[in-house]
């Protein structure tokens, strides 16, 4: 194993760096959980001007944690500086939906954030940049950012479905009394919204088909809506949105993207037309990670039940795209 002194430092940009998700995320990155425990990291924290004080406090705490792999921290409100030389970026900062605000307005307001950030990535990031959009509405925010970065392959932009994926595993593990690591071949199709389709059609646990172990009515009437609405449930109980679980899922996604995995995951990537899903949207698909790239798990048989739910997600994402067409 190479010592940290002999491995090139990876620059990681985190937007919304003073927020709750980043407060959990940054410690995991600094601890080597994305690039490995032999790879030094430099953190670049992007915030809006009025939140720079909060980001400064976060940086102070990171330094006080004395991570052996943490080489430097930059705090800035300038996107060009934040993405300069970045090898990985977590786009966490987003404008939350205001009371009574229409989804079209939410999309447009976030377009004003993710468009300029996409351009800054295009102009400044390293050639091997990987961008994970966490801030919602994540799928269409990823589309906007990618459209503003024509020199960066669209496959270098992802939106996070891993939280939904992990929630699906958790619900099954609780239902069946099994460990989360025992489950394989779960997928969450579509949009990171209440329309999403957590799918257990191909799932196994300990060599058994999950569909043989759970009741179909429970699957349709409890499991799917519970996973899809878990974020709202946590807000109702906690009084705040999911933060630590979102950060943990973002780490899972980026680690697997960088280091590779043959285990199925769910990632929102640019549609290639696979499974009859139209191109031009970022959609959750069953994936594995090989050679630093996500590959779609192909050849799966799709039932009419699945088809209807996958199509509903594609239509929702196409409608979101139309709402921000002037930004693309």
From Swiss-Prot:
Record-stated family: Belongs to the LDH/MDH superfamily. MDH type 2 family.
Lineage: Bacteria, Bacillati, Actinomycetota, Actinomycetes, Mycobacteriales
Pfam families (UniProt xref): Ldh_1_C, Ldh_1_N
Binding site for substrate: 97, 103, 136, 167
General function of this protein: Catalyzes the reversible oxidation of malate to oxaloacetate. Exhibits higher catalytic efficiency for oxaloacetate reduction than for malate oxidation in vitro. Almost equally active both for NADH and NADPH on the bases of the kcat values at pH 6.5, but catalytic efficiency for oxaloacetate reduction is 50-fold higher with NADH.
Subunit structure: Homotetramer.
Protein name: Malate dehydrogenase
Swiss-Prot/TrEMBL catalytic activity: (S)-malate + NAD(+) = oxaloacetate + NADH + H(+)
Known EC number: 1.1.1.37
Gene Ontology MF term list: L-malate dehydrogenase (NAD+) activity
Residues reported to bind NAD(+): 16-22, 110, 117, 134-136
Keyword Mitochondrion applies: no
Activity regulation description: Citrate activates the enzyme in the oxidation of malate to oxaloacetate and inhibits it in the reverse reaction.
Keywords recorded for this protein, A-Z: NAD, Oxidoreductase, Tricarboxylic acid cycle
Annotated active site: 192
Biological process according to GO: malate metabolic process; tricarboxylic acid cycle
Gene3D superfamilies xrefs: Lactate dehydrogenase/glycoside hydrolase, family 4, C-terminal, NAD(P)-binding Rossmann-like Domain
Organism encoding this protein: Corynebacterium glutamicum (strain ATCC 13032 / DSM 20300 / JCM 1318 / BCRC 11384 / CCUG 27702 / LMG 3730 / NBRC 12168 / NCIMB 10025 / NRRL B-2784 / 534)
Gene: mdh
CDD domains: MDH_chloroplast-like
InterPro entries in alphabetical order: L-lactate/malate_DH, Lactate/malate_DH_C, Lactate/malate_DH_N, Lactate_DH/Glyco_Ohase_4_C, Malate_DH_type2, NAD(P)-bd_dom_sf
